Amino acid sequence: TNYAFNNAMRYDISDQTTHWKVDLAYTSQVNYNYETPCLLEVYPEKAPGIDLAPNEYFKSVRTNELLMDSYDRQRRGLMIKKMYRTLAPWTTQNPIFMHLVSKNDQEVKNAIDQCVATGYEAVILSFGSHLNMEDSSMANIKKWKTLTDYAHQHKILLGGYSLFSSRRISDADDVVDIKTGKPGGAFFGNAPCFGSNWGLAYRDKIKYFFKSTGFDIWENDGPYPGDVCASTTHPGHKGYDDSQWRQMEIQKELYHWLNESG
């Protein structure tokens, strides 16, 4: 499905849209009480209130089914791999990269030189490095564009780490718990709402950074985990019932933009 989250790293756990129901009309089933889960319904469970503005279009959740013809584990694994290569070919893009915790620009250049010497394909500035993609100042953009150009001259990709969830921003921008009316209750405890002023600005800053520097890889730690938000003042969603859907759409649009931009 294209509506999956919760940080499980496994599609069968992260799938939020697959619901197996019973079918009382299926009277020939083995289960005496007709409770065999055999009727598949696909829908997002926590997105019941999506209002469309004039000229706005709605694109529903999409789920792909793969029919298995064997219990053989290896064959099933090959079938799943082929499905991903066909439906989501970008999942095959796995460059050999070095994770770097840099403290200055020279360490980045040294890592790029090491990658050239050892056959690595990319450098990713990791958590704790001196990279800040949310800094849109001219000085920061110029610095990282210079380093990106250096990497590209040596045919090395350059990327960086960015944390979205599991961080507290402010009462005005964090996810609001429906039970308390206050920030909190998110998947990671506290988390920003992607539909808040901060969340929308974060999206725009990431786009600006990549467009201005030529960076190649975005390592997004704690992407949107499906948090619902009860705020009625965030510009990116109306209220609780559309908050999950709208935040998911914001993240997907950002990922699509990055992929389309190379």
Regions found by a protein language model. Give the residues of each.
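Conserved, mostly hydrophobic/aromatic
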Residues: 55, 115, 151, 221
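Short, well-ordered coil/turn segments that N-cap beta-strands
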Residues: 92-96, 119-121, 152-158, 214-216, ...
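The substrate-binding groove and active-site-proximal loops of carbohydrate-active enzymes
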Residues: 94-105, 126-142, 184-203, 215, ...
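Aromatic-lined carbohydrate-recognition surfaces of secreted/lumenal glycan-active proteins
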Residues: 158-169, 247-262
